């Protein structure tokens, strides 16, 4: 009995040594409604458990992008009307940050925005890229300048460097070069785009609210606004939504 107790003690797993499960960021996107920013804020509120370090929303009004990124919780930053009034447009994406890579700085809070050749892009990303450091080092040697320490910027840089002609194919070209788990909600040239990694490691669902289509990390973000769940985005799938039209 004593030997058995010693054996069990040797392999005892202490709670303090077990890594906590963290959802690691939440993403949301919606296209086709004048209330895009407000509905994005509600969706992020439902996804708050996925990240509490910071939150952000980027909207597009047909001509310009509008961005608000803050430290703290969604309820502390996006419940007042004046905050949402700045975020005009029928398309919006949002992000709750739980830092998996990069430090606690406002620059690392998403969605990121970049004005690229071929069109502007804003991106919200949940996941970890296993080859991000390698790609980053390679691009820095070739002259790239990074503004953040987040692996998400690696995707933006790859899109910027792509030789493809249009922004959608630039994004697909970038996705072909990254490894790891990811779920993306992107605005590019007035279009909402969703993408999920080939293994489906990170969740991403498609929903509909009236005439608007929605991308979200979980169905709870659909439930809070009364949206209908359509299906999960499939492994390795890229979905393109332009206002109320969807192309797969």
Regions found by a protein language model. Give the residues of each.
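Conserved short alpha-helical segments that host acidic/polar catalytic motifs at enzyme active sites
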Residues: 1-245
């Amino acid at each position: 009995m004593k030997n058995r107790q010693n054996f069990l003690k040797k392999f005892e797993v202490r709670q303090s040594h077990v890594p906590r499960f963290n959802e690691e960021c939440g993403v949301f996107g919606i296209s086709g409604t004048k209330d895009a920013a407000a509905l994005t804020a509600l969706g992020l509120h439902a996804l708050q458990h996925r990240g509490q370090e910071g939150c952000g929303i980027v909207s597009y009004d047909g001509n310009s992008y509008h961005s608000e990124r803050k430290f703290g919780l969604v309820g502390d930053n996006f419940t007042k009307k004046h905050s949402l009034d700045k975020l005009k447009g029928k398309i919006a994406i949002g992000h709750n940050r739980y830092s998996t890579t990069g430090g606690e700085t406002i620059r690392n809070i998403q969605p990121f925005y970049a004005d690229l050749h071929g069109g502007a892009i804003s991106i919200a990303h949940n996941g970890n890229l296993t080859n991000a450091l390698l790609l980053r080092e390679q691009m820095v040697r070739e002259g790239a300048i990074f503004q953040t320490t987040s692996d998400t910027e690696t995707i933006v840089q790859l899109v910027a460097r792509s030789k493809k002609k249009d922004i959608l194919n630039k994004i697909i070209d970038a996705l072909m070069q990254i490894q790891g788990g990811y779920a993306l909600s992107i605005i590019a040239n007035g279009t909402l785009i969703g993408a999920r990694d080939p293994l489906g490691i990170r969740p991403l669902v498609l929903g509909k609210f009236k005439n608007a289509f929605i991308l979200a990390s979980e169905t709870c973000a659909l439930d809070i606004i009364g949206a209908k769940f359509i299906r999960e985005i499939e492994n390795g799938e890229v979905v393109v939504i332009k206002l109320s039209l969807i192309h797969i």
